[in-house]
Swiss-Prot record:
Main location: mitochondrion
Keywords assigned: Membrane, Mitochondrion, Mitochondrion outer membrane, Transmembrane, Transmembrane helix
Domain of life: Eukaryota
Segments crossing the lipid bilayer: 8-30
Keyword flag Mitochondrion: yes
Subcellular location: Mitochondrion outer membrane
Protein name, UniProt field: Uncharacterized protein YJL133C-A
Membrane topology: Single-pass membrane protein
GO CC annotation terms, alphabetical: mitochondrial outer membrane; mitochondrion
Length: 74
C-alpha cells in the first residue's frame, strides 16, 4: 500500500514538473522567434515584410551607397 502511494505520488510530481518545463520552454521559444533588439525596430516579421515591400527601392539605394550591393556602372 505504501509503495503504491509512493509510486503514484512520484508519477504525479514528475508529470507536473514536466508540464511546467514544457510550458516554460514553449514560451521561451515563442519569445526568441522574433526578438526586438536595438538594431531591429520591427515588432513582428509581418511588419518587417510590409515595410520591405513599401520601401524596397529606398533600401536598395541605401545599400548601394553603403557599398552593400553592386553599384551600376556609369
Amino acid at each position: 500500500m505504501i509503495a503504491q502511494s509512493t509510486r503514484l505520488a512520484a508519477a504525479v510530481s514528475s508529470s507536473a514538473a514536466s508540464a511546467g518545463v514544457s510550458r516554460i520552454a514553449a514560451s521561451a521559444m515563442a519569445s526568441t522567434i522574433f526578438k526586438r533588439s536595438p538594431g531591429n525596430s520591427f515588432n513582428s516579421f509581418k511588419e518587417y515584410r510590409e515595410n520591405a515591400k513599401t520601401y524596397g527601392p529606398l533600401s536598395a539605394s541605401l545599400a548601394t551607397r553603403r557599398h552593400l550591393a553592386h553599384a551600376p556602372k556609369l
